[in-house]
């Protein structure tokens, strides 16, 4: 058993290092270079090893007797299974249409080959909507008509930011537009099974996290959850009064940002508590207990924020994960802090001094996610 745990820890750390390195490789050598890492057989095998060994540990320890813990770890396996299905069976591409033209083909991203759709897409109109009394775009809208080859059925609908067309297993989403506003670029995503399995994993994860927190029956956790939801509501109400980028005009914005920011705040407090713990050696155990108390909601909220963001990405861009640098560093942060819960498997986390030092170092992943990506690595999330 100890050997298996050491193998898991080794692979886990290697995957963290590879994820971090990939973001810098993307910065220096471009997205295609990073994609070579994310699609490499050894990268996929690393996740597979972690998933299989996790299942083996769950079986050997009969974790189903602790249902919330069992569901929590099982959800990660389901999410990884969904990601594998997406990788093996999914495809993405682009369609370019001028107003009044139609096509039944798209150019696949990975191979640049022309692929065929089971229906024809015609662009009736394209328009850019603006906020009242301003020239600031509020949305990009493509009015399209789709006609099926199988039964000649057709639909007419608008595709815009945060409004994806889902038809016959394909998802079409607003990607870009021509400078003269006479044409539109639509993204194409075909992934009927991978997304479904991944969403199932998200659902299991959410249920297990909530069960884990409420199982503690701690009023502070419940208050934190309530305060976070209130912040999300107020954030969304304020956002509706201010011009936003079209992609940000989503009700999920407030939930995503609020949970992430509350999580970062709690992790910052834990880091500060760690510094105090190193100087006050007589109280280091008590301070460690406080940090552990705060770590539960911090990681739970971070997980909720990440996966709400993934759902939002699926609605906005047609895909739930794009290996954007901020996504990757948020995942790294989640994994780094998640490791600290496993003190029974890794006894070092039971040592107050080690725990405090770990929490101090771990905050660097938060700093990198929140500031480093925006000011150094860039990516889709670098709005600031």
Give each language-model segment a name.
Residues 1-384:
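Solvent-exposed, non-transmembrane regions of integral membrane proteins
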């Amino acid at each position: 058993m100890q050997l298996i745990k050491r193998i898991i820890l080794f692979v886990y750390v290697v995957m963290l290092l590879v994820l971090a390195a990939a973001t810098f490789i993307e910065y220096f050598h471009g997205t295609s270079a990073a994609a070579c890492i994310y699609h490499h057989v050894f990268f996929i095998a690393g996740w597979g090893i972690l998933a299989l060994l996790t299942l083996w540990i769950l079986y050997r320890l009969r974790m189903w007797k602790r249902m919330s813990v069992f569901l929590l770890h099982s959800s990660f396996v389901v999410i990884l299974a969904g990601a594998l299905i997406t990788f093996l069976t999914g495809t993405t591409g682009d369609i370019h249409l001028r107003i009044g033209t139609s096509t039944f083909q798209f150019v696949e991203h990975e191979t640049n080959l022309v692929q065929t759709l089971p229906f024809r897409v015609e662009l009736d109109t394209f328009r850019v909507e603006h906020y009242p009394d301003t020239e600031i775009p509020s949305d990009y809208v493509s009015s399209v008509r789709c006609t099926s080859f199988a039964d000649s059925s057709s639909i007419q609908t608008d595709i815009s930011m945060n409004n994806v067309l889902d038809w016959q297993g394909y998802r079409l989403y607003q990607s870009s537009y021509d400078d003269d506003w006479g044409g539109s670029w639509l993204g194409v995503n075909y992934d009927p099974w991978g997304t479904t399995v991944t969403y199932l994993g998200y659902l299991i994860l959410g249920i297990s996290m909530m069960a884990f927190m409420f199982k503690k029956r701690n009023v502070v956790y419940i208050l934190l959850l309530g305060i976070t939801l209130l912040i999300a509501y107020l954030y969304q109400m304020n956002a509706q009064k201010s011009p936003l980028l079209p992609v940000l005009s989503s009700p999920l914005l407030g939930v995503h940002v609020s949970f992430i920011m509350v999580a970062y705040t709690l992790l910052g407090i834990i880091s500060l508590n760690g510094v105090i713990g190193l100087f006050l050696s007589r109280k280091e155990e008590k301070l460690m207990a406080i940090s552990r108390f705060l770590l539960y909601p911090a990681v739970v909220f971070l997980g909720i924020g990440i996966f709400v963001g993934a759902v939002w990405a699926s609605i906005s861009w047609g895909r739930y994960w794009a290996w954007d640098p901020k996504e990757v560093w948020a995942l790294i942060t989640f994994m780094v802090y998640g490791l600290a819960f496993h003190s029974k498997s890794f006894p070092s986390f039971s040592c107050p001094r080690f725990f405090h030092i770990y929490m101090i170092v771990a905050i660097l992943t938060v700093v990198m996610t929140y500031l480093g990506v925006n000011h150094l690595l860039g990516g889709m999330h670098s709005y600031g």
